[in-house]
Amino acid sequence: MAVFDPDLQPSSDRGHLLTEQSNQRSSHLDQLDTLALLELFADEDRRPQEAVAAVAPALAQAVDAVANRLRAGGRLFYLGAGTSGRLGVLDAAECPPTFCSDPQQVQGVLAGGSAALLRSSEGLEDIEAAGRADLEERGFSTKDCLVGIAAGGTTPYVRGGLAFAKSIGALAIALACVPTEQAPLPCDIDIRLLTGPELLTGSTRMKAGTATKLALNTLSTAVMVKLGKVYGNRMVDVAASNSKLVDRSLRILRDLAGVERERGLTLLEEAGGSVKLALLMAAAGLSVDQAKAHLQQYDQQLRPALAAYGAQLAEA
């Protein structure tokens, strides 16, 4: 049972926010049979995809800006509280195994820290200064990027972080699910995922959360494509850290370079587990040291590195 704190003061009335409004389609939610309930959920869950598609120009601007900063040595931070913060942590955690990126390159910062991943700590979102403090603790600087995530656009913790990022000349990106005029945020790029009122009024872990996850997937993956972590549609910088990913690495070598499994294992071992190096070694006939130097010359971009040797891979 929740414990009510009589000393806790309510926020200003947030009833005008899109995410707090009642969805008329679900006014009898508690009276629907199970199938009708699930069909309604499925129908409303089309809205997140539509919301992400509608902000493609702003997302593209964010991708290019973040990629440029990461290429120059900057980092990407997701900052949020509750569901929004947890989604940022999730996306950041997936980057190292998928793209073999430095764990410090993309970071999720959640109000309340790691304990808030498992146990709700929403009260911490009310402290605006904490957003700045959590970034400062991580050495956030002018060359870095911040995505401040707040479904309702009013979270003081996120506002504080975005204001700090703006004040030092870092890239500040706001991600919210209400129109800008309802909850303006200090930012350089403003992304508004308008998913509409939730079926369960105010429960932004639903459509707003789904849209946020889709947008973060898109942002981080597109940035990594720009950084040369992908060839065709293959994750050629995958970290072969478990049996499944070793198998995936071997299949990438087979499909793109025609390397059979036994030879692929040898190449992977020589390349220290780097699929990208192994592909360049196989296609251009290079030693591991030659492949490393060549990739460095081409800023870790596999396609131009191959082209310099007149080599190419399949596009499967």
Curated annotation (Swiss-Prot):
Pathway involvement of the protein, from the record: Amino-sugar metabolism; N-acetylmuramate degradation
Keywords from the named record: Carbohydrate metabolism, Lyase
Gene3D superfamilies in the cross-refs: 1.10.8.1080, Glucose-6-phosphate isomerase like protein, domain 1
Positions of the SIS domain: 66-229
InterPro entries recorded: Etherase_MurQ, Glucokinase_regulatory_CS, MURQ/GCKR, SIS_dom, SIS_dom_sf
Transferase recorded as keyword: no
Any one Gene Ontology BP term: N-acetylmuramic acid catabolic process
Keyword Repressor annotated: no
EC number: 4.2.1.126
Active-site residues, Swiss-Prot/TrEMBL: E94 (proton donor), E125
Superkingdom of the source species: Bacteria
Family affiliation: Belongs to the GCKR-like family. MurNAc-6-P etherase subfamily.
Task performed by this protein: Specifically catalyzes the cleavage of the D-lactyl ether substituent of MurNAc 6-phosphate, producing GlcNAc 6-phosphate and D-lactate.
Protein name as annotated: N-acetylmuramic acid 6-phosphate etherase
Gene: murQ
